Amino acid sequence: LPRPASGCRQGRGLPEVHRHRRHRFLAPEAEFFIFDKVRFENSMQRSFYEVDSIEAPWNSGIDTEDDGTPNIAFKNRVKKGYFPVPPIDHTQDLRDDMVANLQKVGLILERSHHEVAGAGQQEINYRFNSLQHAGDDLMKYKYVVHETAALAGKAATFMPKPIAGDNG
């Protein structure tokens, strides 16, 4: 256990901490990516991860989408994914489902939109809370985002920078 500050007996000063804690608020900006495919390996001879998003710039030259429909070239450009609308934003419906589910677990949401990275970066902001509850809110947020993406056959990740050369 940490030692009390010099000249302070064990437990003194704690009411002061609680008094300040009531007036502190926190709401992290937990941006995430939605990917259509994720592969990884960590074995004795190799380590890698590979991600793919149908809206990513590197998919502008593919012949067909994953569902077999023709590629009609609505793809984001590198660092140009901020707030696109469909058909470039392929994730709007899934993000709307995430918003609905986050509201069901009690988070008060402020905004949601596609973020700067072209390959599926998302942002859903929720209202700040006390320090006591902010950690719980973040865990609920991440759980709902992961589960909603998985139910849609996608992968959500909170990795800080999964795409080289793009925002994260």
Positions of PLM-derived features:
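Glycine-rich, acidic/polar active-site loops that bind/position phosphate-bearing ligands
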Residues: 1-168
